[in-house]
Amino acid sequence: MERSDSRDLYNFVRASSLDKNSTLFDASQYEFFGQNLDDMELGGLDDDGVIAPVLGHADDDEYHLFDKGEGAGLGSLSDMDDLATTFAKLNRVVTGPKHPGVIGDRGSGSFSRESSSATDWTQDAELTSWLDEQDQEAKRWSSQPQSFAHSKPLYRTSSYPQQQPQLQHYNSEPIILPESNFTSFPPPGNRSPQASPGNLHRAPSLPGGSQLTYSAPSPLSNSGFHLSGLSQGPHYGGNLTRYASCGPTLGNMVQPHWVTDPGHLHGDHSGLLHNLVQQQHQQLPPRNAIMSQHLLALQQRQSYAQLAALQSQLYSSYPSPSRKVPFGVGEVREHKHKSSHRSRKNRGLSQQTSDAASQKSETGLQFRSKHMTSEEIESILKMQHSNSHSNDPYVNDYYHQAKLAKKSAGSKAISHFYPAQLKDHQPRSRNSSEQHPQVHVDALGKITLPSVRRPHALLEVDSSPGFNDGSGDHKGSGKHLEQEPLVAARVTIEDALGVLIDIVDIDRTLQNTRPQDGGAQLKRKRQILLEGLATALQLADPFSKTGQKSGMTAKDDIVFLRIATLPKGRKLLTKYLQLLVPGTENARVVCMAIFRHLRFLFGGLPSDTLAAETISNLAKAVTVCVQAMDLRALSACLAAVVCSSEQPPLRPIGSSAGDGASVVLISLLERAAEVVVVPRVMHGNSNDGLWRASFDEFFNLLTKYCRSKYDTIRGQNQGSAADVLELAIKREMPAELLRASLRHTNDDQRNYLLNFGRKPSAISESASHARGGQINSESVRG
């Protein structure tokens, strides 16, 4: 269908205005989707005496709309001017993509349209006459006696929560339409070649149909009738070469700027568009007439359309609705400040984006940062890598290196199984518990607590006020977790094991290296750690210079007993005894504590194999430590057995109930037998008296136990055969312990043992064995 020219359409509109049934357009009767328009105001152009015509293209669909004979539904010419004014107003207010909405309904016709982007403008030979006619029509509107005090503008409906006041805002993804065979008013025959490049691009809005926008008339602003094209399908075709012929400004200046500046690839491009507007504005003469003003708006739209088309062609973006901003005389002057402000803002954002892109291209790392440069991030990565990738195999490959060192123990190969750097221990008081311990996060992301003194609560429950008003058990349960006995013992065990590991590292370093000072500093550090661990165990020492030799209570070794209750605690004591230097005061103090609690430690053998092995290893460690003691330390340990409040389990070796106590006592007596010979040769020593007193008490304790055990066996085996009684006595009597004691007995003690078993033959044999051992002992001593 052929398109009507502008003169025929104008005559048709004038004829429609003579209809006697036509009425003026009342904007107050329309609401959009239930939104009240009472709070809106009617606005217009700033200059009363200047008329800014608004011209635009019209798509074929809109011409089809008039060719179908629906022109009668448009109303009078006054209504048409009213609609044109509203159209210009809506295009000036709406800045974002909107959903389609019905704008008006007049008589037999109802027209609506969606928001569209900036359209191209053309001029022809009839432009001057068209503007004159529109000026006369505006004067006729101004002469009508109608009040517009309560008139309100019609705003397009939108699902957006807010309206943005920016006017010169264009979408970065325009839609490219194929070229049309016709221009807007006037007809194509009179098209000017200077204005024709603007026809290369038309950006439609959301697809959905051709619509018109209507507006209430205003006495202060009159605009020309404006129709804009609307796309009906995905018209994305076009050739990039046709945009190169739009002029030197676009082909030579705009295109390299879009290609080289990465900041405009993201976000708003209103700053760049505004710069083009300013360049066009500076090239125009002063706006003294309507024609010069129209030419300004015309060139602005050409630049916008061409720039948007070039961007879409270069980057093949998806179609999205653009924003249409018709520029009049007052609009260019009104929004110049806002556009410049946004342009400066967008230039800053573009610069930041360009910096981030340059960092990524230079370093090659796939990361972006807002507050840090790539050099700073690289330095942090290097520090993290150095912390998480240590070159010390003792730390990274400990178990494999330990296996290799164990295999090469018998060979002459040099072992490198020692740490490259020792830990630096900070002095800390045992009672100074941190309320908020620091949580250390290593380079691998593992969270390591300094200790288990403050374990995280699995569940925090606030008890009711009446809960603590009950019995004393409820009150006791409200104490802190660290105050629980076993929890405190576990905390001490973990801390002590950490200290022992550091001591082992020092020993390996001294064994495999040769320090300049001969290892004096490391040995001193090792001694300090051992003393600190002995202090943490809170062991009582009656023979110390500041200690009390009498008056010990059961609470003196409470920490030691709680640690020894747990199998891990007994392992700790075993390892500690192995690391102690034999014959030192610390070794004596620990061994005295063990001898004071022989029944607690070796009273029973647990059913668990690992726990039983732990007890056996502890007895062996004590035996090794005792073998290096002097007579004073041996006397102190034997006195600890005598002064204990618990009777030691004096069982025979190999007893199913456990023979740990007998093993350590036999080792002590044997070591004392080796040491006591020297004082007799040297004729006098002060420690001999201490040992003599300690042994006498121990012998009385041993004989009482043997007498009690003998009576118990006889009572259980009354009427039994002699061989049965003899087997029971051998199974229960500590013959090995009695034999080890004969070397330290005097004449009275030996006579007691001789008279001990004269009644039955089995006891006589036991006594004779004791006498024979005593004789052999005396013959050895000489």
Swiss-Prot record:
Entry keyword set: Cell cycle, Cell division, mRNA processing
UniProt note on tissues of expression: Expressed in root vasculature, shoot apical meristem (SAM) and leaves.
Listed Low complexity bias regions: 108-117
GO biological process terms on file: cell division; deadenylation-dependent decapping of nuclear-transcribed mRNA; mRNA processing; stem cell population maintenance
Source species, domain of life: Eukaryota
Region (Disordered): 96-153, 177-217, 332-372, 460-481
Compositionally biased tracts (Polar residues): 208-217, 348-366
UniProt feature, compositional bias: Basic residues: 335-347
UniProt biased composition (Basic and acidic residues): 471-481
Phenotype seen when the gene is deleted: Enhanced root distal stem cell differentiation and increased mitotic activity in root quiescent center.
Listed GO CC annotations: endoplasmic reticulum; Lsm1-7-Pat1 complex; nucleus; P-body
InterPro entries per the UniProt record, alphabetical: Pat1-like
Subunit structure: Interacts with AFPH2/NINJA.
Reported function: Activator of mRNA decapping. Involved in mRNA decay via decapping. Involved in the regulation of root stem cell niche identity. Maintains root stem cell niche stability through the interaction with the negative regulator of jasmonate signaling AFPH2/NINJA, and the regulation of cell division.
Record's protein name: Protein PAT1 homolog 1
Lineage: Eukaryota, Viridiplantae, Streptophyta, Embryophyta, Tracheophyta
Gene: PAT1H1
